[in-house]
From Swiss-Prot:
Residue numbers annotated as active site: 83, 114
UniProt lineage: Bacteria, Bacillati, Actinomycetota, Actinomycetes, Mycobacteriales
Purpose of the protein: Specifically catalyzes the cleavage of the D-lactyl ether substituent of MurNAc 6-phosphate, producing GlcNAc 6-phosphate and D-lactate.
Protein name (database record): N-acetylmuramic acid 6-phosphate etherase
UniProt source species: Mycolicibacterium smegmatis (strain ATCC 700084 / mc(2)155)
Pathway: Amino-sugar metabolism; N-acetylmuramate degradation
Amino acid sequence: MDLSALETEGRNTRTTELDRLTVPELLAVMNDEDRTVASAVRDVLDQIGAAVELITESLRRGGRLIYLGAGTSGRIGLLDAVECPPTFGTTPDQVVGLLSGGPGAFVTAVEGAEDQPERAADDLDAIGVSADDTVVGLAASGRTPYVVGGLQHARGAGAATVSIACNRDALVSRYADVAIEVLTGPEVLTGSTRLKAGTAEKMVCNMLSTASMVRLGKVYGNLMVDVRATNGKLVDRVRRIVVESTGAEPETAEQALAAADGHAKTAIVMLAAGCSADEAARRIERAGGDIRTAIGAG
């Protein structure tokens, strides 16, 4: 596989003397390069939005968001997946991260795993990929065999497919219903796509999961109302969320949370609509999780 023509593998003309720079100079040039990433992501907001629609529809019908990748790209997808349960109250199987070489490859690289497209098919089959799911393949180069094979297999299973790459005309784009190509250009350190490309992939994943969860009613204003108080930090956060959402006194918020089994959304509906925890839960279910609809559904 010839990668020499890829922009992410090219030499950055602004950093050819990287080893001669002072530490302040080196950090400044890295920061300057990083500042270009947000602009590159902004250029593909339409494609990101289209992917959000696919993901939201999958989650609404009981399907999953499945990230698929190798190396840094796979780790970024896995990182976003594992953050969804504590942030949005999802179950661990609603947002899934598949990493070539398995979970152990997050810490220790599994040599050659990314070059085996059949591994992705096996990994997807192991979790029962179906037409209800959206599979997001991450590959900075746009050519990783594991990701190409995974997207092909997901399509064959009827799943919606999204690709994220950092080169134009990426191979993975051919197998995606929505192709996201964030053109981050040559890296500060030649070929080290854990830098700008990795940052871009993380930004896109942040958008995909967060925007989808907002659409699903897991956010009220800008507050994480589906979070459950499972540790000391979250107990305090959930109490503050209820207070800020309703204007209730902290003691009143605590009483509502106790009745709501620590669930912020239920406590908010209880206080805002003046109803019991059971009635709040019923309202939320009838409203499909949308808190504003639940409050007004008297």
